[in-house]
Amino acid sequence: MDPFLEFRVGNISLNEFYRRTIQSEFERILEDPLSNMKNYRFSKQSNYSTKEKTPLSIGVNCLDIDDTGQVLLGGGDDGSLSIWGLDESLHRNDEGEQELINKRLNYIKRQPHQSDDEPAQIMGYKNKRTRINDNNTMRLVHSFQTQRNKYRMYRQSSAAVPVQRSHISNKTDSPIGFSETLSETDSEASISHHKYGITTLKWYKADNGMFFTGSNDKTVKIWDTNRFEAVQDINLGYKINQIDNNVVDDSSLLVVASEDYYPRLIDLRTMNSGVTALGMGNQTRMQSEILCCKFNPVREQIIACGDMEGGVKLWDLRMRNRLYSELKRNKNRFKTINNDDNDDQSDVYFSSNQSKAHLRCCSDIVWNSEGSELCSVGMDGKLNVWRPFTEILQPEGLASYSQLGTQDLSRIKYKKRVSRRLLWFDKFLLCITDNGEVEIYNTEEKKLWNKLEYPMVNQVKKNQASHCQFSSMIVQTNIMNSVGLKLFFGTNNNTVSDGGSIFECS
């Protein structure tokens, strides 16, 4: 029966009707994604032009959409940042019809001739007004609430160009209970941009007036969205691979995966108290670079991390500096790497009956929306779905798991080409490969459902096409302006597309 009719007669709830509608939209997009695909470049020009575009020769390393579904954030491999308003502007297409398009609201990058002590150049629009420089002005950069009090954190700053957006939050209506000037590791001018490529970024869950970025310059930056400038610089001393923010509305926790052997935890409420390193100083064997980290969407105290050796570890913040569990698998349930069916042949990749989650490095992990299952992908060519919280565990404490699709050693060729490879939406799981495609799996049927290949406008040489890769992706789940659900893919810097692009599937 049609979901709308079921909702009208009272067979399903409003939430179930919304979930089925979103799933139907997602299936519609994935059945023929190339038919309704739009291409947006990270253009230096503010206005939209279908005929003349000045491409920015950079790759789009990471994308994220805020909880309102109206603002898209993109990070480039040269340290640049772009912010887009989705369905922000009207444009007349080739048929003469008006259609909604995405509009770049702001852009910032470090210029090639710019020294580290100079502020980054912010490229805005003509209708924006520059605020007067007032060093005595304090502005809100973060707010949070406890059971008894409300707090706001302020910072003294200089002039910047504001982003005129009505749906970008600027929470200033709560009573002042506490104010603290955030400390910085460098001078104010030196934190206004990233020196090297941005590897990861994340919106603040509770308020889109703030977002976070991590870079190869070994820093995590906290940004003010309205002014589009960095207000806090946290130097960790290691290249940043991935960051994540807790999904709880009033959460102030950030987890950071870096080249260090220990995941780092940052509490925005106690910035001056330092950064917590999980597992440091105890008996936990931590001898591998952390590549990925994710908060559990339901059990907010659980953090999952994947490392270079193929291990996947779970941390419980309620257990002080202790490992909650490590996901392992039994060698008897897996064939050797050459798929030999001879039981007498031992698997040289296992030294005991137990093994890490992957034979080689774990490139990315992702939770399902219920927080009950965790999917991991590794360079051993396997996609594993784990159920770490099942009451009945496997013998010797091994977590319950299953494999999605078949083993493909060519799926992941590079350890750190992409910061985020996995996206889990409803029953579908998307995986960015190193073969110029996105694999789409049905997690209920445990098999490959569809593939999205890199769109080629013209016939190109095979050696050129091999360099065209997807590098990031995000899904807009909020249905805005009656357009429906959307998928966004960022691409690398390649000669075929004259630089990185953002592809929109709707």
UniProtKB/Swiss-Prot annotation:
Originating organism: Saccharomyces cerevisiae (strain ATCC 204508 / S288c) (Baker's yeast)
Positions annotated as WD repeat: 55-94, 193-233, 285-325, 357-396, 404-451
Protein name: Radiation-sensitive protein 28
Gene: RAD28
GO terms under biological process: DNA repair; proteasome-mediated ubiquitin-dependent protein catabolic process; protein polyubiquitination; transcription-coupled nucleotide-excision repair
UniProt keyword terms in alphabetical order: DNA damage, DNA repair, Nucleus, Repeat, WD repeat
Entry-linked InterPro entries: G-protein_beta_WD-40_rep, Rad28/ERCC8/Ckn1/ATCSA-1, WD40/YVTN_repeat-like_dom_sf, WD40_repeat_dom_sf, WD40_rpt
Localization per record: Nucleus
Protein function: Involved in transcription-coupled repair nucleotide excision repair (NER) of UV-induced DNA lesions.
PROSITE patterns, per the entry: WD_REPEATS_2 (PS50082), WD_REPEATS_REGION (PS50294)
Pfam families hit by this protein: WD40 (PF00400)
A single Gene Ontology CC term: Cul4A-RING E3 ubiquitin ligase complex
Keyword Repeat annotated: yes
